[in-house]
Amino acid sequence: MVKKEKTPSPYTKPLDGGWGWMVVLHFFLVNVFVMGMTKTFAIFFVVFQEEFEGTSEQIGWIGSIMSSLRFSAGPLAAIICDVLGEKATSILGTFLVSGGYVISSWATGIPFLCVTMGLLPGLGSAFLYQVAAVVITKYFKKRLGLSTAIARSGMGLTFLLAPFTKFLIDLYDWTGALILFGAIILNLVPSSMLLRPIHSQSNNNSDIENKGSILSATEPEASYKTETSKCKETQEPFIKDSTMKKSEQPTTTLTVLGNQSEEFSNRPHRNRPLLMSNGKSHKKKFVSWNCKQKLLDISLFRNPFFYIFTWSFLLSQLAYFIPTFHLVARAKTLGIDVMDASYLVSVAGITETVSQLISGWIADQNWIKKYQYHKSYLILCGVTNLLAPLATTFPLLMAYTILFAIFAGGYLALILPVLVDLSKNSRVHKFLGYASFFAGIAVLSGPPIAGWIYDYTQTYTGSFYFSGTCYILSSVSLFFVPLAERWKRKQSDLLRTTIK
């Protein structure tokens, strides 16, 4: 007889507060020290042009490598997290960013800086950001939107870091400024120690990664308890070949633990359910097959929700940086003073920060599903950018800037909560890592594409049209979420029928 029970779990409810706010503090500092300083690269851009007499294209590669690696190194960050754990990975990322800035102070050329200020900080940023993002999902559920928005608001302090960076360069030269930046970022080492591990077991077990169910006897010792993050050698009991006589085989009650996935019936024999007879199991030591597959898990590519999220994430990241980079340049072509144009950037930063906080709080009220908010914000961003060429005066440009910052802040605050909802809170590391890899390609190619459009048309209106189109297209995949949910339910029903 087979009977179903819910997964016995030692800890299933996120704290939604308590020590979780310390994790939010760490995530906030990551956004301030790492992401905020990345945005101040424009100041070093001018300095490097004068120091090394390089072209804009050559020096632009430094910033492009740094920005794109924060996303495209996501799969590597996921693997490192599985091997070392979140806390060690975060500390490693801190040393990479800090060391990259310090070594850059001895730079002798642009290729040198591409490695020390592009590659190293880019990898470190990926490690820091992904670890903080994943750990915060373990501590928060009901308040995930608000907690993420508070953490991301650190990026809004860029308008304060820009004059601070200029002050350091004027006072200590660019070499001294880089050394000080490296020292400041080292504060993330004690901050990373706040990432207290939390061991939980949900219905969608993260270690098992939905690769199948576990069948066990009703004895407590048969429960399968997992530890998040680290991939270790484990001993798994499995059924031993035997020639028991029929009369010697007693009736066994089996308990189905957890939610089963559609992949259950296709798993190899060594990954089949754990069967126990008479409350006793025949055990043999071997290295966990799950652990071997953990470092290179391609099962995500059979998950429709992964494609839905990745399509939306890729195109929205492709679109986001284009108006950000070209806003001031477009204002200059309209005859607006550079100082007035710089106010647009400051207003955008402040508005986006406030918008993220409000968006996160609204999403946590669960009036509608979070991806519905996300989809609406993306569409509004697209419409706003498609109408941007109509803004030909400073007041109209200011109105466009405020509207775009409101809608952009709205969807940026919901990227992580939507990811958690679509991934069903399982394999968040891998889900975010692989999706970020494709987003990194978009970040690397977006500004050059927009630049090519300007070179071809000699106007920035084409860049805003391109951005608006990408935003509209990024929302399309989210319309397929209900279809994917129905498909998932059919697969679950079919699996339950097969087990019965």
UniProtKB/Swiss-Prot annotation:
- Say if the entry is tagged with keyword Acetylation: no
| Extracellular side stretches | 38-58, 109, 175, 326-342, 396, 452-463
Please provide, alphabetically and separated by semicolons, the GO molecular function terms listed in this UniProt record.
symporter activity
Pfam families according to UniProt? MFS_1
Q: Which stretches are transmembrane?
A: 17-37, 59-79, 88-108, 110-129, 154-174, 176-195, 305-325, 343-363, 375-395, 397-416, 431-451, 464-484
Protein name in UniProt: Monocarboxylate transporter 5
List the InterPro entries: MFS, MFS_dom, MFS_trans_sf, Proton-linked_MCT
Q: Which residues lie on this side of the membrane: Cytoplasmic?
A: 1-16, 80-87, 130-153, 196-304, 364-374, 417-430, 485-500
Function field: Proton-linked monocarboxylate transporter. Catalyzes the rapid transport across the plasma membrane of many monocarboxylates such as lactate, pyruvate, branched-chain oxo acids derived from leucine, valine and isoleucine, and the ketone bodies acetoacetate, beta-hydroxybutyrate and acetate.
Q: Does this UniProt record's set of keywords contain Transmembrane?
A: yes
Q: How does the record say this protein sits in the membrane?
A: Multi-pass membrane protein
Q: Gene behind this chain?
A: Slc16a4
SUPFAM superfamilies, per database record: MFS general substrate transporter
Give UniProt keywords alphabetically. Cell membrane, Membrane, Symport, Transmembrane, Transmembrane helix, Transport
* CDD domains registered for this protein in UniProt: MFS_MCT5
What the record says about family reads: Belongs to the major facilitator superfamily. Monocarboxylate porter (TC 2.A.1.13) family.
The entry's cellular-component GO terms read: plasma membrane
